[in-house]
Amino acid sequence: MIHFAIPALLFAHLTIAQVIIIAEPKTNVTILSPKSICTFDTPAEGVKLDRKELDAAVGELKGSITDLQFGALSAALSHSKIKDKKEAAMFMAHIWHNSAGLKEKRELYCMVDLERCKEPYKGVLPGRVYYGRGYMSLATEGNYREASQALFKDDRLLKNPELVAEDECISWRVAIFFWERNVQDAAKSGKFGETTKRVNSAECASGDKAANDIARRRFGYYKVFLKAFGVKEEEAKEEGCY
């Protein structure tokens, strides 16, 4: 991967709320804010999201998405293996559910009582607790190591697991890494339930109405994103989970 020096002067007039997006095919650098710079070593051949379409879906779900979130999501998806809006809608439905509408990027149980999470989520490095972080909740030392090596060819996420929650670009890249590694082949079936089974198989337990109702809620989100992305409603296949 090529590293680029970003002139400090470029950020001199910016506040953290402001966003600059630079689509630069030759350098694969997207500048989101002074604290979030996306770099990629893969070509931009993934799906392109339309802001108005995404806003329509998020609005129908009575939520919102910030410029920073959209910029990072757009950059990460464009460099992903997600090629069409049907799969993007599946991805966004699970993200919406797992992050409580793009609001939560840390495992709430551990935020309330970190001490109880230290033992199950401990690692080799002292002081690090590898509980669930990010839009797809990356958890355990092994998964942090695997994601870090796959995305950056180093151990930065092991050394600083908080990056998965704090850096918007990394949050989305880790979520897409999880999707491509664990869910994407199921998404190709076109059956949304198959993707739910990969994301959280417990929701597909036979005869467990409460769990199945959560899975149905995910499917409801999928239909909202699918409609907003301009995909025909009959494309929404529910089967594969309960």
Question: What residue ranges belong to the model's regions?
Answer:
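Peptidoglycan-targeting cell-wall enzymes and recognition modules
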Residues: 38-65, 72, 86-178
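Low-complexity, Gly/Ser/Thr/Pro-rich intrinsically disordered linker/tail segments
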Residues: 202, 206-242
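Classical eukaryotic N-terminal signal peptides for Sec-dependent ER targeting/secretion
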Residues: 1-10
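N-terminal signal peptide
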Residues: 9-29
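GST-like fold's C-terminal all-alpha helical module
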Residues: 171-192
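Surface-exposed patches in mature extracellular/periplasmic domains of secreted proteins
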Residues: 65, 79-91, 104-108, 185-196, ...
